[in-house]
Amino acid sequence: QLWSMENANSKESILSAQYSKDEGNTGNQMPAATSFHMARGWSDMYPELQFFKDFPEGARKEASFVTDIPNRGFSGGKIITKTPSSVEWSVSQRFHPMYGKWTKSEDLTVGPRTIGFRAQEVYRYSEVLLIYAEAKAASGSMDASALEALNQVKRRAAGLDPNTADASVDVTTATVNDIVTEKGWELAGENKRWFDLIRTETLEDAIAKRDPNEQVPLVR
């Protein structure tokens, strides 16, 4: 499990910010930022509904989102679990799933809000693979090495061996848009997608795809 505390500094990590509970620092705020108030977070960010629905099923989706929202309170100086212990996302406080990457390493013992001490990824190996594939596609030189880089990400996302070809997920062609879309799924909730949408001038396209049931208004 990539997002566990144990894998915070695995071979996947290229550059990351380190935290230590033993050193008494303030910790990683991403668990609170991506958790709803009812889960003892701040509801700062959560996935747009159509993005969640379009996200390919599989191991990566299961790791990226929380669909049963924890129902917690704060009593006696500690975070407690209420009854029921969780609520299905569509009837939850925010009517959305939560991002789940940072909740895998959350610490509920420090204070009234969930916090974490897992290293925060700035760049990781899968992003390097996708940057390479996109650069090759953008330069008109998409080749076997670029497709292999993309397919390694797609295989792992499906819970397969990333280094073994698999016709069920491998692609034989890919455009820049295909790769940027894959990057959006791979790095969901990691604060990268906005920059890719702006860079590729596809922000308006993403907005146009918003689910009509989306309850979060856009500020214009």
Describe each model-derived feature in a short phrase:
Residues 1-27, 59, 69-220:
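Acidic/polar-rich alpha-helix caps and helix-coil junctions
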